[in-house]
Amino acid sequence: MATTHVAGTELEFKAAKPPLIKPFLVSIGIVYLLAMHFFMPNPGGSGLALAFNPTTWLALSFSIAIGLYQFGTQGKLRYNKLTVGLFISCVMLTLPVLYHNAAPSLSSGKLIGLWSGYLLFVVLQQFRFSNKQKQRLLWFITIAVFIEALFSWAQFFLLEPGNIFGYNTVNNRPYGIFQQPNVMASFLATGLALSGYLLTRQPTKYQRKVSEVALLYLMPVTTIPLLIFLASRTGWLAGVLSVGLLLPYIYRFATKKRFFGWSLAVIAGVTIGLSTNMISADASLASQRANLESPRQYTFPQALDMLIEKPFTGYGYGRFEPEYIVYTARQHQLNEAYKPGLAAMDHPHNELLYWGVEGGLIPLLAIFLAAILVLVRIAQTTRGTRLALFALFVPIVLHSQLEYPFYHSAIHWITFIILLYWVDQRAASYRQLSLSFVSQTLLRVFSLVIPILVSFFMLTTLHTNYVLTQFERSQPKTPELLEQVSNPIVWQDRFDWDIFSTYLNIGLHQQEAKFIQPYIDWSLEIIKDKPRPAFYNNLILAYQGLGETVKAEQIRREAQFLFPERDFSQVSYIPPNIDVLKAQNEQEQQ
C-alpha cells in the first residue's frame, strides 16, 4: 500500500480562512456604542462640522475595511436584485453632477456619503451572519438610542447654565449629542420602534431571567417622555405611526405577557412625559409646537415651483441656496404676496425636493426606483410582518421629508442602511460572482488604504475645529492661532470668515485699505454660492471703509432685493477718530 505525502505541496488541503464576522460586528458596535457619542465644543452646523460625525465616519471606515478584506479573501461577490437596483439608483443620482450647471465641489459631500452608504450595504451582504448576529445589528442601534436617552435625561434635569456641552438650559429641549431636537426625536422614535420589534423576535425561554429583554421594556419609558419634552412634531408623528404599525405585529407574534408589558410601558412613557411637562416651567412649549404654523408652509411650495420651472435639468447640484434666494426674490418683486426666501437655507427640508430641484427628473426617478425595490422586498416577507418592517423606516424616512437628517447625522444614514440590509436578508436569496485575482488584490489594498486616509482626514478635521473654536472664543482675537489649522477643507468657509472678517475689523478700525480689500475679494466670490445677509452687511461696510460709496449702494440694493424683509438701510460705517488712535498708539509705545 503506497502512502502519498501531500504536506507542503499543491495537493495539501488548505483550510478555509474563518470569516471576519466577529471583528466586523465589534467594529459596528464601536460605531454605535462609542464613536457616535463623542462631543467637542463647536459653533453648530451640520455634517462634519459636528464632532460626532467625524468620529462616526472614522470608526465606520474600519468596519468597511474589514468587510472589503473579507470580500477580497473569499473571492466572491454575493449580490441580488436589490444590490443591482440600488447600484442603478446611485448611478442615476450621480449623473447630474456632470451637467453644465452643477458645482461638483459643493455637491461632493453628499455623493461621497451616498456611495459610502451603498458600499456599506454591499459589505453587509458579503457576510453569512447567523440570525442572532443579524439581530445584534439591531441591538446596537437600540442600545445606542438608550445611551442617548440617558444623556438627554441628564441634559433635561442635571445640566446647569454655562455647562461644557453648551446646552441651553433655558429652552431645555434635550437633543442629546445631535444638537438639534428633531434629529434626536427621529433617532429616539427609531429606537422605540426597534424595541417593540426586537421584543417580538426574542425567543421565549422559560425559567430564564427577564434581564435579556428588560431593556426593550425600558425603551418606551425612557424615549416617549423625551419625545414629548423635545416638542418635535416630527418625533410625535413618527412615534405614533411606528407604535400603531407595530402593535398588530406584537399582538400576533409575541406572547400576551410581552404584548401587554410593552403596551403598558408605552402608556407609562406617555403618562410620565405629559405629567412632567405639565408641572414644568416650559409646559407651554409643547402646546406651542402643536400649532402647525411653520416656514415649510411656504418653503415647500417655493421649492416645488422651482422644480416645475426646471423639471428636467434642475438648477445644478450644489446650487440650491443661491438659486432659491434669487428665484424667490424675483417672484416677490413680481408679486409682493409671494413670500421672500429664507436666508441661509441650503436645503428645502425635503429630500425629494432637494434632489429634484438640483438635479431634475433623473434623481427623482432614482429615488422612486429605490423606494419601489425596498417596498417589494418588504412585500415578499412573511404575511403579518410587513407593517412592522415598514414601521422601522417610518421615523427616519418621515424626517427626511421634513428636514435633512442624513446631512446632519451620519448615524442616521448608517442606521438607514442597516435597516435596508435587515429587510433585504429577510426576503432575499443571493447569487455569487467570482472575482479575479486582480480584483481580490485591489480589495485588500483598499481595505488598508481607506481607514488610513479616512482617519487622517477626520482627525485633522477635529483638530481644525478645536483651533477655530479656540480662536473664536479668544478675546481679543489672536490670529496666530489660525496658523495651527491642519485641515481647512471641511471648515473652508468658516476658516476664511475668521481670517477675512478679522482683517476687515482691523482695516476698518485702522482705516487701512490693505486689510479691507481681502475681505471684499473673498466675499464677492462666496456670495455667488452662499448669498447670506452677514456677508452683504460686511461688504457694504467694507466698501464704505474704502470710500467707494457707489459700490456700497449697489451692494445695498442687491442685498435689499434678495432679502426684502431685512433692513440694510441702517448699515453704515462710522470712521474712528484717527487722531485719538494715533495718540493712544504713541502712549502704548512709550
What are these regions (language model features)?
Residues 2-4, 13, 20-37, 56-68, ...:
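Alpha-helical transmembrane segments of multi-pass inner-membrane proteins
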Residues 47-59, 106-111, 175-190, 234-235, ...:
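Membrane-interface micro-motifs in multi-pass membrane enzymes
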Residues 160-172, 286, 290-293, 305-309, ...:
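Interfacial juxtamembrane loops and adjacent helix segments
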Residues 230, 250-292, 299, 304-309, ...:
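A membrane-periplasm/extracellular boundary helix in multi-pass inner-membrane enzymes
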Residues 1-95, 101-109, 116-123, 127-135, ...:
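Transmembrane signal-anchor hairpin modules in multi-pass inner-membrane enzymes, especially those
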Residues 41-47, 153-164, 276-288, 312:
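Helix-to-loop transition at the C-terminal end of transmembrane segments
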Residues 243, 385-440:
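Transmembrane alpha-helices of multi-pass inner-membrane enzymes
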